[in-house]
Amino acid sequence: MADISPETRLNEGLERLSTDLSDWTEEDNYYRGEHERPFAPEGVNKEYKALQEMAVAPWIRLTVRAPVQRLRVDGFRTDSRSDVDRNVWLNVWKANRLESLQRIPYVDGLVHGRGVVSVSPRARKRNSPKVSPESPRDVYVGYWDDDPFTPQWGVKRWETVERDLGQVVTRTVEHAVVYTLTDFYRYKRTPGGQWTPETSGANVLGRVPFVEFRPEADSLGRTLSMIRPLFPMQRAIDTMRFDLLLAAQFSAYRQRVITGYDPVMRDADGNVLWRKNPDGSLYLDNSGQPQPVLSNPGRPGVDRMLAFPGADTKVFDLDESNLSNYVTVIKMLVQQLAAISQVPPQYLLGDMANLSGDALAAAESTLASLVNDLKYEFGAAWEEVIRLADIASGGTGESLASEVVWGDGEAKSFAQIVDGIVKLIQVGFPRRAAFGMIPGATQVKVDSWMQMAQDEAASPYVYNLENTVGDDAA
C-alpha cells in the first residue's frame, strides 16, 4: 500500500476534530454545569429566569470527581534495579508536576471518552523528558486499520495570537503538527489562508508521541463518554428542581381568597369613580388605561377585624403546595443517577448515619469496582507513557517493564491498616513492600523510611533507648 502523504493525514485529523467538536463542547458544558436550562415559556420575567438558573445543579460533575479523587499514582515498579523506580519518579513524574496534573487525563477520559498525554525529549535535560496532558479537543490519534489499539499517526493543532512588526491589530494564527512513526511535519495557516509547511524532521521516538486514556474503548476502538448516558437524567433533575422552586416561590404558603366582593367604588348612581391627578385629569397607568378608586378593607392583624360589604361575600383559604412530593421525586432521580454512574447515593444525597466499616465498604463496593477498572486502563496508559519517556531519555523503552503503583483511595481505618502491616512484617513479609501499603506512601517516602530504619538500627543511642524503655515497662 502506498504511503499516505502528511497533508492527507493533516486534513483527515483536522476533519475528525471538527466533527467531534460539537460532542466535545456538549460534554464539557454538562461537566461544568453550563448546559441548557429547564424549559420555560417565552417572555417570562426576571423572577422566572432567576429560578431557572437556580434549578441547575452540577450532579454530573460529582459523578466524575468521585472516582477521579481515588485515582492517585504513588510510584512505579520495574524489572530493573530499585533506583530505576526512583529515577522515573523524580525525573519524569515529579519533574513534570504530574502529581497534580495526572487528574486531567482522568477527567477527560471520563467526560470525553479519551484523555491524552504527550511525550517529547528535552534538548537541555535529556534524562528528564517532557510529559504533558493534552486536550482531546485539539489532538487526534489515528490507529492501524487492523489494530485499533496501536497508534499509527497523530495530529495536534493549536492557535497563537500574533502581531506584525509595527502593527496594532492582532491576528489568530493556526498551527498543526503531524506525527508518523518516523517523521513529524509542522504546518501554519493565517486567517483566510491555506495550510503551508513550516518544518519537518525525524520522530526520534519512533512511535506516535500521544498516549490516549480510553476507559470505555470497545473492540473496534470506539470510545464513549461515560457521562453522556447521564444527560437525560441530569435534565430531569433540573426540571424537577425548577418545578420545586416555582412551587416554593408562588404557592408554598396559604393564600386567602375573597368572593362576592367588588372593591371598585361607585357613586350614588352606580358609576365607577376614577382616580385623578392633582390637576383634576384622569390618572393613567403604564398602558394608558384609567384606574378606578378601590376601597381598602384594611390590613389583617391579631387585634383587627376585616369587614366586607355585601351579603354574598365569602372568605376562605387555599392550601399551600406540598413541597415534599417534589423532594421525593428529586431524591428518586438522584438515586437513579447514582446507580447508573456507579457512585454511592450517599455521595450525592448525604444520607449517612452510624454506618459500620463493613456497611460502608458494602455501600461503596460499586464505586470501588469502577475505580479498579479505571486503574487497569489508566495504568496501562501510564506504562506506555513511561516507555515513551525512557525512549525520549535515550533508552530503548523495551527493557523498562513498569507497573503503576496506585494509592489506596478507599475509606479504611488507619489503625486497622497499621495492625495488618505489623502482622505481615512479623511473619516475614518484606518491610519495603509493607511500608508501601501505608496510605500516602510514595517511592521516595519508602526509601526515606528504609534509610531511617537502617540508621536507627545502627545507632547505639536508639539501642540503649529501646532497652531502657523495655526495662521500665518490665
For the regions a language model picked out, list residue spans one by one:
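Extended, helix-rich architectural segments
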Residues: 1-134, 138-140, 144, 148-149, ...
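Generic recognition of stable, solvent-exposed alpha-helical segments in well-folded globular domains
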Residues: 232-235, 325-332, 336, 366-369, ...
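Extended, charged amphipathic alpha-helical segments
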Residues: 198-362, 404, 409, 413-415
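Membrane-proximal bilayer-interacting regions
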Residues: 411, 418-448
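Extended, regular secondary-structure scaffolds
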Residues: 111, 116-224
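Extended amphipathic alpha-helical segments with heptad-repeat/coiled-coil character used for oligomerization
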Residues: 393-427
